């Protein structure tokens, strides 16, 4: 067991994922060649460098994704075939009130999640991004989202899980357990903001929210 080395629980009053809020002196890889990449193609690598995100298909076997999804249904005491169970209150209390109603599932260390984290293709993808085999797993929760009920005003929100001013920069991965298209799924990003962050931030007020950017005027750039 590792001792808590975060002084005075300094993450208590800020949003985001504490496991990505700080990192070591290791910086993300800056260059690569086809023969040094394990999972990414050189085209995917160039896309990653240009747009700040990349999609790795079939990162885990479909059967394993289904087992994980079935576990989440069971953990939340909901039935995929019974819509009446979908919108019942979550089982666990959400400490981060801004996440209430967003489908977050308060499970972190179940073996299904660890099986996914330790898949060779998942590991190798991060080796490609970081440029090192010495990786430390960040721990995060799962998500079980449903179609928004009629009359709901909630909209997904673009956010960072750590302050982008953190240097060296960090990186996260999101594992989709079901097929997604333009109209479904929980992940959104703004590649334009990735490419233009340093100039964009100069247009923002000094007291801007470092975790939830003002995306006014960027709506057409969300993917």
Where do the language-model regions lie?
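Short, conserved beta-strand element in jelly-roll/cupin
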Residues: 163-182
